[in-house]
């Protein structure tokens, strides 16, 4: 049984990475497509990544992208390797895509810190899986229907 789980993890990460290579590098598209495909193959893929100690989740009604970008640049300027979803999408699939881009085939993330911009609607389903060490809430307004 354990071999099947390991193969599923490896296969979903491999296919996600290949999708990232084809869609992202060759066609310059697909900010979330690799994550969508990997998630379809393995609904628990977020559990399969070995994240660094510092995982920062940025959420809120507005200002998430700017805050994430500023934080990532600060960490980079301090010499840290940073994994973050910088392609403009803040859904679960985009977080998975950024992890696929910055991890080895065994799921170990090759960064010192992860900073994830995430839509406030997805935070509840993502937090238990990535277990952020820090959470930044930019603001809370009623800008979208529940």
Regions found by a protein language model. Give the residues of each.
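Phosphate-binding loop of NTP-binding sites
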Residues: 2-146
